[in-house]
Amino acid sequence: MTVAQQAPSALNFDCETGNYHTFCPISCVSWLYQKIEDSFFLVIGTKTCGYFLQNAMGVMIFAEPRYAMAELEEGDISAQLKDYEELKRLCLQIKRDRNPSVIVWIGTCTTEIIKMDLEGLAPQLEAEIGIPIVTARANGLDYAFTQGEDTVLASMAHKCPTSAQVQGEDKEERNAIQKLLTFGRKADQEKVESEYVDHQPLVLFGSLPDPVVTNLTLELKKQGVKVSGWLPAKRYTELPVIDEGYYVAGVNPFLSRTATTLMRRRKCKLIGAPFPIGPDGTRAWIEKICSVLGIEPQGLEEREAQIWASLEDYIQLIRGKSVFFMGDNLLEVSLARFLIRCGMTCPEIGIPYMDKRYQAAELALLEKTCSDMGVPLPNIVEKPDNYNQIQRIKALQPDLVITGMAHANPLEAQGINTKWSVEFTFAQIHGFTNARDILELATRPLRRNSQLGELGWDKLIAKDVPAQV
């Protein structure tokens, strides 16, 4: 049930001054250390940071994880201990125990407050110990926890080699994607190369699980587009070659800092495309890449229609229902666009931070989707005030609220269906084939309450509860 609204003619952006109810960006360690297999992440912070990492990722004593806490003590903060000597001692221990290809220093709020010059210490120390060091300020001063990955990738973009630095066979062997597609058979190299159209090199950026990377790479290969590399690569030693004039495209909405670094520092050309989330977004993403590279896309309309047909059983559950985004991980606009295309309405999209330049193509596709589906445009609220949001939720009574973990239980107590937004962060939601996983997550609370009602367990479903949040 939704309150009738007058349809706005263009996207409306509001900005409130609410608190950021989100995880700390140092949580990016939890997926990046698994993605970059030869890395070691050293988080430099306080006991609070350590407690958070333990809660977020588990202790994992026997697994020997490739991340650790460098706990700041009173001597560090009062400048009685030398930062360089302490970090050198820890990095030498990491080199001796794990021997990684790269050490990533993750700065925190405390390193910012005490003005610890990690960027200045790293070049001197990496020359002394012989291991590259990447520094990233993934602190709680950011807007959303997913921006921790953005900071790390922006720092890593500086470390990508140029073609002049990579000679001979090393250049060919760096690219893990190329090796995957050729299966290591040198004899088939010419045949594989003939499947691609001659175009400017393309590098994709964004950390995705290996099956999704393979999937998107193969989707582009069907159009004759060759992916020169991914940032981050599976191994640090396989970072993509990036030269001036290369094309780059992002796969996630929260990577605006990485995009800016690639454009300004590495002189790359950014392909401003919608993000490959949902069949509609994936098709638009591929079409935009093809158009920039001068390639005529083939069969995408049929491919998209085939995926939509396979999703019909889920779409029937949400068609005509409303969804409200409170804002948490910067994926809100892409998810809202996909759910609107599935037949839902979305009165409001809360988002911690909006880079309108980087998300321009996604916002344009959102407008087009609303127009095609004949539904009102959502109101986009940047830095939403949670108290005001809850009042709006009470007035609108949406069928589903996608929210951070802090607000899920209070809203459920009010009889409102909720879904944790963090689940979309860790699920495989990119590409044509993973659209079903998005709908599986989005419809789960609706299906759960429907099934409880059918079983006669209505007392487990809170309805029309007058209590205050």
UniProtKB/Swiss-Prot annotation:
Binding site for [4Fe-4S] cluster: C24, C49, C109
Family of this protein: Belongs to the BchN/ChlN family.
EC number(s) on file: 1.3.7.7
Catalytic activity as recorded in UniProt: chlorophyllide a + oxidized 2[4Fe-4S]-[ferredoxin] + 2 ADP + 2 phosphate = protochlorophyllide a + reduced 2[4Fe-4S]-[ferredoxin] + 2 ATP + 2 H2O
NCBIfam families, per the entry: DPOR_bchN, PRK02842.1
Oligomer and partners: Protochlorophyllide reductase is composed of three subunits; ChlL, ChlN and ChlB. Forms a heterotetramer of two ChlB and two ChlN subunits.
Top class in the EC scheme: oxidoreductase
This protein's record includes keyword Aminoacyl-tRNA synthetase: no
InterPro entries: LIPOR_BchN/ChlN (IPR050293), Nase/OxRdtase_comp1 (IPR000510), Protochl_reductN (IPR005970)
Name this protein carries in UniProt: Light-independent protochlorophyllide reductase subunit N
UniProt remark on cofactor binding: Binds 1 [4Fe-4S] cluster per heterodimer. The cluster is bound at the heterodimer interface by residues from both subunits.
Pathway: Porphyrin-containing compound metabolism; chlorophyll biosynthesis (light-independent)
Keywords, in A-Z order: 4Fe-4S, ATP-binding, Chlorophyll biosynthesis, Iron, Iron-sulfur, Metal-binding, Nucleotide-binding, Oxidoreductase, Photosynthesis
Function according to Swiss-Prot or TrEMBL: Component of the dark-operative protochlorophyllide reductase (DPOR) that uses Mg-ATP and reduced ferredoxin to reduce ring D of protochlorophyllide (Pchlide) to form chlorophyllide a (Chlide). This reaction is light-independent. The NB-protein (ChlN-ChlB) is the catalytic component of the complex.
HAMAP family: ChlN_BchN
Species of origin: Synechocystis sp. (strain ATCC 27184 / PCC 6803 / Kazusa)
Keyword Iron: yes
Family matches, as SUPFAM superfamilies: Helical backbone' metal receptor
Cofactor(s) this protein requires: [4Fe-4S] cluster
Gene Ontology biological process terms in this record: light-independent chlorophyll biosynthetic process; photosynthesis, dark reaction
GO molecular-function term, one example from the UniProt record: metal ion binding
